[in-house]
Amino acid sequence: LTNMVEELLEFSRIEDGRFTLSIEPVDIKAELEDAVYTYREFFRREGIVLNYEDCDEDFDPIPADPERLRQVFSNLLDNASKHGGSGKRIDAAIRQEGESVVITIRDYGPGIPEEELPHVKYKFYKGSSKARGSGIGLAVCDEIITRHNGSLEVGNAEGGGCIVTIRLPMGT
């Protein structure tokens, strides 16, 4: 309930213009790794395996709000655990594509019905999922990434499950 209230407050800040970013140089790879390691033990206790695919590249710091990025990573990992069904596996990865950092978070659950995919980032949209949640978290994540001049895409992964792809620019 507390998380739902926080998400509602966050979205109201976005809608009325009180939502701000505190931009600073951020080690995006370290932020993702911190989120993965924070959740890994919790997930293990729940019977969920959280894999992390680390690319060999080191990234220059990117201009971003580290607190907001942690919020996005936490929300996406939490969503993957809630909607992963009996898949009991989550994969997180980071890589460079051109001038972008690409982060993916994938679960191995049933995926999202094709007719629902265009709506999943709308506020309060919960689709046919029986999982708990407010239907706001993904909308907030999308807004945070958009304000970082990036994109957040949600789709079904080849072989099953859902995959969320974040693209953030490497430069200013």
Question: What is each stretch, according to the model?
Answer:
Residues 16-21, 61-64:
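Conserved micro-motifs of the catalytic ATP-binding
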Residues 22-40:
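A conserved beta-strand-to-alpha-helix junction within the catalytic ATP-binding
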Residues 42-52:
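Short conserved segments within the C-terminal catalytic ATPase subdomain
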Residues 80-81:
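Short helix-loop "hinge" at the ATP-lid/N-box region of the Bergerat-fold HATPase_c
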Residues 112-124:
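Short conserved segment of the HATPase_c
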Residues 137, 141:
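Short alpha-helical Gxxx[C/S/T] motif in the catalytic ATP-binding
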